[in-house]
Design a protein with these regions (language model features):
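Non-ligating segments of multi-cofactor redox enzymes
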Residues: 1-246, 252-291
Length: 291
């Protein structure tokens, strides 16, 4: 499956953005699909978007004048987390794929191994910008801003503000300092993505942070067969998310990309679906080996 990951990412991005003619019209799809969240980071304001961004939808609920915990969106995210974990990041997220395409540009690449403390930032973004600020920093009528979407998310500029402003002169005339700020963030992510592998995913994405909480318990896991592993270290060197799959098969940073599977010379690493620890493997008995 990992060999076809690029095609799966392209297909997922297309399914998430089915209404392509809207790019020329300068309008948004407002059908029933917008009441359903998509699994990856994809802006609601993208003209082609066929569903709602779960992070944006969650903020809209907690920031409303009548605060109520979003059981539907939270339940949806928990379900996806339990079923797939960060497989969504590696296979189904449009913005993750965008960063990977940028990283393919032939330039010198930089390692993020010494920058591991930055991976904890995304949990702060999830807690503070997605939940606490929209819920408790409100205006006179009791409404909070969607702080992550409004002030940090680069996907909103890439998919929403830029295409809409190009097609709509009214929107173009209304662009101001906030757009300049968000555009600078997008530009920074683009430059960093050329040099580093998935910098936004590693350091700032709150959706990835949420799915990471379920990586160790999700049904979709990485499995390491200790009987086949020769401790060559090729899997760890191949991992661009800085994970040693032989030590922590279902690390919170693992996006199930499958690079370790392709690098393993003995086929000791594999995907598995179901309950159980990825490190556990049933050793063959002498009788079984003799068969």
């Amino acid at each position: 499956m990992s060999r076809f990951r690029g095609w799966i990412q392209a297909g997922a991005t297309l399914l998430t953005n089915l209404h392509l003619p809207n790019f020329l019209k300068g309008g948004l799809y407002q059908g029933a699909g917008k009441t359903v969240c998509v699994p990856g980071l994809n802006c609601y304001s993208c003209p082609a978007a066929s569903g709602a961004c779960p992070i944006g939808a969650f903020q809209a609920v907690v920031g409303s004048s009548k605060f109520s915990f979003s059981y539907y969106i939270t339940g949806f995210l928990i379900l996806l987390g339990v079923l797939l974990g960060r497989f969504i990041c590696g296979f189904l997220c449009p913005f993750g794929w965008f960063q990977e395409l940028l990283h393919k540009i032939p330039t010198k690449k930089l390692s993020t191994k010494k920058l591991k403390p930055l991976t904890y930032l995304k949990y702060a973004v999830l807690l503070v910008m997605v939940f606490l600020l929209p819920a408790f920093l409100v205006n006179d009528v009791g409404m909070g801003d969607p702080f992550f979407c409004k002030y940090l998310c680069p996907q909103g500029v890439l998919e929403g503000a830029i295409p809409l402003s190009l097609a709509n002169s009214g929107i173009r005339a209304a662009l101001g300092k906030l757009f300049t700020w968000k555009f600078s963030i997008l530009l920074s992510v683009i430059v960093l993505s050329v040099l580093f592998y998935r910098p936004f995913c590693k350091w700032l994405c709150p959706l990835g942070a949420f799915y990471a909480l379920f990586n160790r318990v999700s049904l979709f896991q990485m499995k390491v067969d200790k009987n086949k592993c020769v401790s060559c270290g090729k899997c760890a060197r191949a991992c661009k998310m800085d994970v040693d799959v032989t030590k922590t098969p279902n690390h919170t940073e693992c996006i199930r990309c499958g690079m370790c599977i392709r690098a393993c010379p003995t086929n000791a690493v594999s995907f598995r679906y179901g309950f159980g620890n990825g490190k556990e493997t049933t050793k063959k008995t002498t009788m079984e080996e003799s068969k």
